[in-house]
Amino acid sequence: MQYRLFILFVIVITMVSCAKKVEDPCINKSAKTVIKQNINNLICFESIDSYDLNYKNKDTILINGELFYPNIKRDYYDAVIMTHGSGGKRRYHKKYIELLVDMGLVVFQIDHYAARKIKYDKTFSKVSGITFMNDAYAALKLLKTNPKIRNVGYLGWSQGGVGPILSHFKSVNDLIPIRERFKSAVA
């Protein structure tokens, strides 16, 4: 019995020590407030760190997103902001990005977890769908600083799908301290 417990203990310790640490690419960087260049890159931007729709005395947080432009050069672009589910950014999301970029859309994929030091949140106790929505509206505000970006849609799934649904409601939009609004949203 002790041998089995010892083996189980070794396996658990090995798994924990091999787990990938969450790294925040925005540490020691400043928030971008304007997007001038039409190039693919990682962007650090400021969001409201709120679990709910009460924004009084809430801290801001520097989070990141990856910006992807289509190879086709245009005078103007439409864009999509992508928000992941409770499992965080996944490799298969790249296929979604490629599909949307191939359609001629600019894609901005938000990482809601790195700055918050979260690997995944299956309990929804650390962040909420509203937290994700706040990040998406902050990303929208940033994207709209680029005069080449016209319409911006909002795409989310699983926990990340809460924001696109809520963004359709006037009562929710009235509470959000950002003026810009999404042209469309899909959950």
Where are these regions (language model features)?
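N-terminal secretory signal peptides that target proteins for export/translocation
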Residues: 1-2
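Serine-hydrolase catalytic machinery in alpha/beta-hydrolase-like enzymes
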Residues: 54-64, 76-145
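C-terminal motif of bacterial Sec signal peptides marking the signal peptidase cleavage site
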Residues: 15-17
